Amino acid sequence: TKAHVGGMAYDTMNQILWVTGQGSTWAQANAITLSHLENYSFDDGYHPIEFDMSYNLYKIKRASFMTYHDGALFVGFFTQDNASVIEKYLINADGTLYEKEDMNLKRTVGVTDPVAYAVSMQVISGKVQGMAFYNNKILLTRSWGILPSEVQIFNYSRYGILSTSEAYK
């Protein structure tokens, strides 16, 4: 699978840890509540912790990295050369992800987990491995192999392509 533990985000409003994942055909966002984490003990049966919620992510190819900002999960995927995307998934007041009411995707594609619907998408350059928000800015980290790593900084309000040529740095 292409998902990795680098894809983690913490929802401070609902106290939920989100982790990227990959289902049989869909990228996923999986959730564990803080209370579940605090009450979990590996010594009680030697079993991995189970997710409290799992969502198939509609529209995104893979979930390589994610971050939480202002009531939403931003999920992106890593590509070596091609442009990639970041999708924005809204978090409801109860901590669940937004599902478009008229979507009948679960039955159509044969999945049992809920299908979260992205409300917006940003095109980004390849080699992005992480994302953060700071003072109305989007920070993207880019790295691959022995090449120098970099942090690209964009205005948060900017829509469209977040390409290397548009970055402050």
Annotate each PLM feature.
Residues T1, H36-M53, A93-A116, R158-K169:
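Beta-strand initiation motifs
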Residues K2, S54-K59, V119-I124:
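Surface loop/turn motifs at the tips and blade-to-blade linkers of beta-strand repeat domains
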Residues K2-I49:
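Long, hydrophobic, well-ordered secondary-structure blocks that form the structural core
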Residues G6-Q15, Y58-V75, T79, I124-Y134:
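Structural signature of eukaryotic scaffold interfaces centered on beta-propeller domains
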Residues L17-G23, V75-T79, L140-G145:
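Conserved beta-strand positions in repeat-built beta-propeller and related beta-rich domains
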Residues T25-E38, D81-Y98, I146-S163:
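Structural motif
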Residues I60-T112:
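Hydrophobic, aromatic-enriched interface-forming segments
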Residues V115-K169:
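Loop/turn-rich, solvent-exposed surfaces of beta-rich toroidal or solenoidal domains
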